[in-house]
Amino acid sequence: MQKLINIFRKIQGLLSAPLHRIANYTRLRGSNFNITFKHEGCVDVKLPKLSIINAVFGSGINFSRNVSYMSRPNAEVLLRKLIFEMYKSGYINKNLSIVDIGSWISDNSIVWASYLSGSGHVLAIDPSSDNLKYSKNLANINNIKNINFIEAVCSEKPGMKLDFDGTIDHAEFKVSESKNSIESSSIDKIVYEGNYEIGLMHVDVEGFELSVLQGSESVLKRDMPVISFEQHISREDVSKVSNYLKNFGYRVFMVNEVLPFCDKDCRNFLAFPVNKEIPQLTKFNQADAYSLGICSAVVGESLIEI
């Protein structure tokens, strides 16, 4: 009897993954492979179309990334709202460029590109060639011309040898002399070589945020962009990043939001130059936050100064 149960479980295991992929494919097809970022001005993003064969076997670089994309409009809702409002109100100059480092599948880069005008570009920086290949295809499908895709990992200075844990598609970097090490670039190098002026920096680099910001010193001094960064507050010393930014004349705030699809201690932060007023953002009753797709981290305002 136990042998039959074990056989059944193996069959169930073999079938569950493709059935789950087919269910996701059905959702994608039902939306005509179109995702709407309803909290960011209802920006529509067309995804690469797939066949049922792609779903059954999970083949190609597009399927898993398309599935991830489906959830992105409902991830980090408060941060998305805040950045959208800062552009809508003119708090951030639309003619300035955006650094999106750790751009992954470019769910931010693609949307934010629609906010920009004039000479403003998004610099979508990621170490994964597959992530960038997918993202370039997205930009082409959606006729977006103002994103520059850059395959790089950045640290406090160019030429550092780095290794990583995990896969290159979602890596945690560290200094290393291993034979598989990758040579770093820096934000300052990329920005100055391209002659960009920066209005927003979004830094999501899996624990390497301080190193990346240290390699942005010239940009911070010259442009004083708004900065968004992520930290795991139960495992990382947030004061290291916040104190570094305060030394450049920033005020640092935690975004009051628990992030779905992330570890429980993951939080977003926003840093604003002290020579500018804190942006006037739409206020809402915290008791209504959940109905807006926001799960507050603590009782209080949308931004909590640290």
Predicted regions span which residues?
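Short helix-capping segments at alpha-helix termini
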Residues: 117-118, 140-145, 220-223, 250
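A SAM-dependent methyltransferase catalytic signature shared across enzymes that methylate proteins
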Residues: 144, 242-256
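Short internal loop-to-helix segment that lines adenine-nucleotide cofactor pockets
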Residues: 68-99, 148-149, 158-161, 166, ...
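Short strand-turn motif at the edge of the Rossmann-like AdoMet-binding core
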Residues: 128, 206, 230-232
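S-adenosyl-L-methionine
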Residues: 1-138, 142, 194, 254, ...
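Hydrophobic packing residues within well-ordered alpha-helices of enzyme cores
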Residues: 112, 135, 212-216, 241
